[in-house]
From Swiss-Prot:
Residues 1-24 form the signal peptide. CDD domains: cupin_11S_legumin_C (cd02243), cupin_11S_legumin_N (cd02242). Residues 50-245, 311-460 form the Cupin type-1 domain. It comes from Oryza sativa subsp. japonica. The gene is GLUB2. SMART domains: Cupin_1 (SM00835). It comes from the Eukaryota. This is Glutelin type-B 2. Belongs to the 11S seed storage protein (globulins) family. Seed storage protein. One of its GO terms (biological process) is seed development. Hexamer; each subunit is composed of an acidic and a basic chain derived from a single precursor and linked by a disulfide bond. PROSITE patterns: 11S_SEED_STORAGE (PS00305).
Length: 495
């Protein structure tokens, strides 16, 4: 008897140690940002010609449309990314599904409710229902619904979708929800082939899809219950065969986004925007304090089941960098948004004012997928050979892939611009070429002077002309004279 108890205790203790170790590894923000768990590309890639992408094909459903970017293009395959844009109409429900790859969603427009179902987590939301007869009289039958947490999303939110975790979205607003989804195919969480696969838990994709500028094709995809035998499925779930066939959605032609006639009846707490912001700040402080004491890790329930799945990146008051004459920059990484340790992705939102310039930079530890939300921006990207691989204007609805280490320079057009950049590292960071904390500011004057064959005065001008500006620059240096430089300065040598 004692031996049996000891054996059980040993097994339980070992399981707890494994859980503690895995949780600490997944959620520990001190993970080396220079290291990435991505598998990398399995092919020789050439990033010598970049292009601005628009959706290539779309699949319509009853209450919305899903638009796919060209996943077969070399740039998507080499960066290991998959991108879709989805529109959900009012009272539209994106049916539950899960994916083999983690992803980030940015809500461009609209608001609604969403759910992530983490395995093993308790149903913390409980709701009582009373059935009524057709005459409105209460019947004796009552039932209770229990489910996991429901999250409210709105414009400007970044939503994390871990691989293998079922999720759903519902539009409870008056306008369509428009969202851009970026999936990381090369993430180590994906042990299947390097392709994005969605496993539908309901509905199907037996819809006609249109390829932009080309033909119309038939697209077919059933939910996972369709592959099980009806008898075996009914026995496993304890239901009759009629109900099992409904789960298989064999004759359901609504697609993956379905219309909810009278709206979803959901139990959800309501918070004002101020309350939500205060709660988010409190959670950040609480999370930061937890990291100071590793012994506070308490396994599955403390982390997965209570972790925040969305954060708003559009709020001006939470900008990381702000220039009142140029614009603002806001970022989310695993330090601010712990679930990104599971996703291994991060995001940066940039709002540039009229003719403002973003300090030239390169992404140190990630690829960057830039989606233009509003306005236009002139963009130039340079390769390791010093050649321009992209020089054009990025317009609303277009996507530009910027490979890791490629230098980039952006300038807003007259109407300004707003864009979201999704990056393939949970703690992505950049190296700026100009302004405060830039490469030039970090170099000694003599190094700059001798490297470019210029005087020390000219080197100091290069280092300091942008003063204390960081990130977004004002356009005030257009057509202006730079101290220490003249038209003949190219022939000058260092002192």
């Amino acid at each position: 008897m004692a031996t049996t108890i000891f054996s059980r205790f040993s097994i339980y203790f070992c399981a707890m140690l494994l859980c503690q170790g895995s949780m600490a590894q997944l959620f520990n923000p001190s993970t080396n940002p220079w290291h990435s768990p991505r598998q990398g590309s399995f092919r020789e890639c050439r990033f010598d010609r970049l292009q601005a992408f628009e959706p290539l094909r779309k699949v319509r459903s009853e209450a919305g449309v899903t638009e796919y970017f060209d996943e077969k293009n070399e740039l998507f395959q080499c960066t290991g990314t998959f991108v879709i844009r989805r529109v959900i109409q009012p009272q539209g429900l994106l049916v539950p599904r899960y994916s083999n790859t983690p992803g980030l969603v940015y809500i461009i427009q609209g608001r609604g409710s969403m759910g992530l179902t983490f395995p093993g987590c308790p149903a913390t939301y409980q709701q009582q229902f009373q059935q009524f007869s057709s005459q409105g009289q209460s019947q004796s039958q009552k039932f209770r619904d229990e489910h996991q947490k429901i999250h409210q999303f709105r414009q400007g939110d970044v939503v994390a979708l871990p691989a293998g975790v079922a999720h759903w979205f519902y539009n409870d607003g008056d306008a369509s929800v428009v969202a851009i989804y970026v999936y990381d195919i090369n993430n180590s969480a994906n042990q299947l082939e390097p392709r994005q696969k969605e496993f539908l838990l309901a509905g199907n994709n037996n819809r006609v899809q249109q390829v932009y500028g080309s033909s119309i094709e038939q697209h077919s995809s059933q939910n996972i219950f369709n592959g099980f035998g009806t008898e075996l499925l009914s026995e496993a779930l304890g239901i009759n065969t009629v109900a099992a066939k409904r789960l298989q959605s064999q004759n359901d032609q609504r697609g993956e986004i379905v219309h909810v006639k009278n709206g979803l009846q959901l139990l959800k707490p309501t918070l004002t925007q101020q309350q939500e912001q205060a709660q988010a700040q409190y959670q950040e402080v609480q999370y930061s304090e937890q990291q100071q004491t590793s012994s506070r890790w308490n396994g599955l329930e403390e982390n997965f089941c209570t972790i925040k799945a969305r954060v708003n990146i559009e709020n001006p008051s939470r900008a990381d960098s702000y220039n009142p004459r140029a614009g603002r920059i806001s970022s989310v990484n695993s330090q601010k948004f712990p679930i990104l340790n599971l996703i291994q992705m991060s995001a940066t939102r940039v709002n540039l004012y009229q003719n403002a310039i973003l300090s030239p930079f390169w992404n140190v530890n990630a690829h960057s997928l830039v989606y233009m939300i509003q306005g236009q921006s002139r963009v130039q990207v340079v390769s390791n050979f010093g050649k321009t691989v992209f020089d054009g204007v990025l317009r609303p609805g277009q996507l530009l892939i910027i490979p890791q280490h490629y230098a980039v320079l952006k300038k807003a057009e007259r109407e300004g611009c707003q864009y979201i950049a999704i990056k393939t590292n949970a703690n992505a960071f950049v190296s700026h070429l100009a302004g405060k904390n830039s490469v030039f500011r970090a170099l000694p004057v003599d190094v700059v002077a001798n490297a470019y064959r210029i005087s020390r005065e000219q080197a100091r001008s290069i280092k300091n002309n942008r003063g204390e500006e960081h990130g977004a620059f004002t356009p005030r240096f257009q057509q202006q004279y730079y101290p220490g430089f003249s038209n003949e300065s190219e022939s000058e040598t260092s002192e």
